[in-house]
């Protein structure tokens, strides 16, 4: 939502307060009515606290419609308004340990709890601790134990009737359990979506080519406020009860913890991550315990909630205009925050992947100061329309690498610059290329680039490549970090004295590695090609290349068209090969590897051109015993004619040659309608005739 009003300075408190009210009301409307939040929580909290402080310093600036005096937005036009019998209030927030200690002190003082001479509470208050879910608050009304209405919070006084949608949530009972139920019960709780259900929903959205949801809260809110309850019924929503509005027909329970236990007996879903504690230390202990397990919880939370446990003490403490005095939300460090993107650089990964990285003005988010954040790839930068100079939303959750979620387009400066992917690697100067149908651009200097050095050496030494026994990752780390090895060719220059000085490398280990390196000098062309670590070139493709060309030079000089003639080499593999050998840095390292005294292999003639007869490219399956041909002889003749001999029958099979006692392969061929030949039919094919 656009925020075009100019931001007044703090030296103009009346204008500043009006601007803050406008910003917060716009955010409230986007959050509560449109279900499209456009401000991170941390930014909203910052603006809200600033307005609170302004109104405290200048009481004359307080207006009846100030966001500090109410909860959220107005009911949207698509749903029937519902006036709450008991207001659905918000909670005041605490962020630091000092905030929690101050809350406990205020409560204890108001309840006339005993304190010592230093002012410390010696008669601790009992609190019920719960999770603060990141979902949508609702009220469920039961009459004589039967579910009759559900409504959203709205502005705390008036919400929206979402009864038919809530009726589709399977975890919400339509009738309460037990013989003794109240005449009227308003249950307060949260509609949310579990992480696993959110992932499945987005999978369905992708499969249907529909817009994906940004996060579980948006998905839950959007699902709950569908005008068609059939759509809501298809969404995997859940519910947890945590509070009460109206109770008629039976006395109120003595404690909040007893209320939640009673809810469970009625069949209402109540979260088990709750605890009764004493005083500020107990509150902080619960907060830390939940913080440690936060990422492993099956749903999103953004903090915990503390409530004075005894009902009579809650009543004594009462309410302020927008929140109860007996409760506090203790929020985790914000996982999203706003900052300025000052530059976009690129990083080179171990495999040559080029990743755009946002350089940011320092911002505290997710419990740490963040100055860099990933932009994933060039397509993501374009899709999110992120530009240098933008005010951006940065997200950091747990140990996840910080990322730029998006930009606030209404704050974009006139000189904001688009990101341009460089054409040369910033580390080694090799060309940057991006293969068709791939999102990631890569440095093509795989054998030369320092950023890829360890990965290139590790791959080169693999058992299926040069098979250098004893050259593990820890040894490679030392060799690279001590600048003893820069490319695979340098491995063959290592001497005994150098190796023997490596950490935890005895003389015997040094000699064993030298022996392995000497042995690795005598290899095969296929192993050497595989060892180069060319993207998309596996062991099988390396063998096909060696068989087709016979020697390395023709492969290095081959055009894409010539590479496409190789068995099982398609456009992507051909392009990858061509890019790799076109990079001069790679060719230099290869020549160093082929220098006298280094790596050698037996050369062979190029394979003859593939036959062009009726069997060329066909797949044939042999089964049973033929009258005059052994299976090996038949296979050799078929392969010489350009056919591929497979071991099982599938839809891709062109012919089945069946002899005596053919068995299940013959049955499957007949089921699939695949032509079945005897030995005479095979000879006709080999002679170029279609049977």
From Swiss-Prot:
DNA ligase that catalyzes the formation of phosphodiester linkages between 5'-phosphoryl and 3'-hydroxyl groups in double-stranded DNA using NAD as a coenzyme and as the energy source for the reaction. It is essential for DNA replication and repair of damaged DNA. It catalyses: NAD(+) + (deoxyribonucleotide)n-3'-hydroxyl + 5'-phospho-(deoxyribonucleotide)m = (deoxyribonucleotide)n+m + AMP + beta-nicotinamide D-nucleotide. The gene is ligA. Its EC number is 6.5.1.2. NAD(+) binds at residues 41-45, 90-91, 130, 153, 190, 307, 331. One of its GO terms (biological process) is DNA repair. One of its GO terms (molecular function) is DNA binding. Zn(2+) binds at residues 425, 428, 443, 449. Keywords: DNA damage, DNA repair, DNA replication, Ligase, Magnesium, Manganese, Metal-binding, NAD, Zinc. This is DNA ligase. Pfam families: BRCT, DNA_ligase_aden, DNA_ligase_OB, DNA_ligase_ZBD, HHH_2, HHH_5, Nlig-Ia. Residues 610-691 form the BRCT domain. NCBIfam families: dnlj, PRK07956.1. Its cofactor is Mg(2+); Mn(2+). It is an enzyme of class 6 (ligase). The active site is at residue 132. Belongs to the NAD-dependent DNA ligase family. LigA subfamily. It comes from Burkholderia lata (strain ATCC 17760 / DSM 23089 / LMG 22485 / NCIMB 9086 / R18194 / 383). GO terms for cellular component: cytosol.
């Amino acid at each position: 939502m656009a925020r075009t009003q100019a931001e007044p300075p703090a030296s103009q408190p009346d204008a500043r307060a009006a601007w803050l009210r406008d910003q917060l009301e716009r955010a409230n409307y986007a959050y509560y009515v449109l279900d499209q939040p456009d401000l991170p929580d941390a930014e909203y909290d910052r603006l809200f606290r600033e307005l609170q402080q302004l109104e405290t310093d200048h009481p004359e600036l307080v207006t009846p419609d100030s966001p500090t005096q109410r909860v959220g937005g107005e009911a949207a036009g698509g749903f029937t308004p519902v006036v709450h019998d008991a207001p659905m209030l918000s909670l005041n927030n605490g962020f630091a340990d000092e905030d929690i200690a101050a809350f406990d002190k205020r409560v204890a003082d108001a309840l006339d709890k005993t304190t010592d001479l230093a002012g410390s509470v010696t008669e601790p208050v009992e609190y019920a601790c719960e999770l603060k879910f990141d979902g949508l608050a609702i009220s469920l009304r039961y009459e004589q134990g039967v579910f009759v209405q559900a409504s959203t919070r709205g502005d705390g006084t008036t919400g929206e009737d979402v009864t038919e949608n809530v009726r589709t949530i399977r975890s919400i009972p339509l009738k309460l359990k037990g013989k003794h139920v109240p005449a009227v019960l308003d249950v307060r709780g949260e509609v949310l979506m579990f992480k696993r259900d959110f992932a499945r929903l987005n999978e369905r959205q992708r499969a249907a080519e529909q817009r994906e949801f940004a996060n579980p809260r948006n998905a839950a809110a959007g699902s709950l406020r569908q005008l068609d309850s059939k759509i809501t019924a298809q969404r995997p929503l859940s519910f947890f009860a945590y509070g009460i509005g109206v109770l008629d027909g039976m006395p109120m329970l003595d404690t909040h913890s007893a209320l939640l236990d009673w809810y469970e007996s009625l069949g209402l879903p109540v979260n088990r991550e709750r605890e009764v504690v004493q005083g500020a230390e107990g509150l902080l202990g619960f907060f830390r315990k939940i913080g440690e397990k936060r990422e492993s919880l099956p749903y999103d939370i953004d903090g915990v909630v503390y409530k004075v446990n005894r009902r009579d003490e809650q009543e004594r403490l009462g309410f302020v205009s927008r929140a109860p005095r007996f409760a506090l939300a203790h929020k985790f460090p914000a996982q999203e925050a706003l900052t300025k993107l000052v530059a976009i650089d690129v990083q080179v990964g171990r495999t040559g992947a080029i990743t755009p990285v946002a350089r940011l003005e320092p911002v505290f988010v997710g419990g740490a100061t963040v100055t860099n954040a990933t932009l994933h790839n060039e397509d993501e930068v374009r899709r999110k329309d992120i530009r240098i100079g933008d005010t951006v939303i940065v997200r950091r959750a747990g140990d996840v690498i910080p990322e730029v979620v998006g930009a606030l387009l209404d704050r974009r400066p006139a000189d904001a610059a688009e990101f341009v992917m460089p054409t040369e690697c910033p580390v080694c100067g090799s060309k940057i290329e991006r293969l068709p149908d791939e999102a990631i651009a890569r440095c093509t200097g795989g054998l030369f680039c320092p950023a890829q050095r360890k990965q290139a050496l590790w791959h080169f030494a693999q058992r299926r490549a040069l098979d250098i026994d004893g050259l593990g990752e820890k040894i490679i780390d030392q060799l690279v970090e001590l600048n003893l090895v820069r490319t695979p060719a340098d491995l063959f220059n290592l001497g005994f004295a150098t190796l023997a000085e490596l950490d935890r490398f005895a003389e015997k280990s040094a000699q064993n590695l030298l022996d392995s390196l000497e042995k690795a000098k005598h290899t095969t062309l296929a192993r050497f090609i595989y060892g180069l670590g060319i993207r998309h070139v596996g062991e099988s493709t390396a063998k096909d290349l060696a068989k087709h060309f016979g020697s390395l030079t023709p492969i290095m000089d081959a055009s894409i068209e010539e590479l496409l003639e190789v068995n099982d080499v398609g456009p992507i593999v051909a392009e990858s090969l061509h890019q790799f050998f076109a990079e001069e840095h790679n060719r230099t390292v290869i020549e160093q590897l082929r220098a006298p005294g280094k790596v050698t292999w037996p050369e062979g003639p190029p394979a003859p051109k593939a036959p062009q007869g009726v069997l060329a490219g066909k797949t044939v399956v042999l089964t049973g015993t033929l009258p005059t041909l052994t299976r090996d002889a038949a296979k050799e003749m078929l392969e010489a004619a350009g056919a591929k001999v497979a071991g099982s029958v599938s839809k891709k099979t062109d012919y089945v040659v069946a002899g005596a006692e053919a068995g299940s392969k013959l049955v499957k061929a007949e089921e699939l309608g695949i032509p079945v030949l005897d030995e005479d039919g095979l000879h006709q094919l080999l002679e170029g005739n279609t049977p």
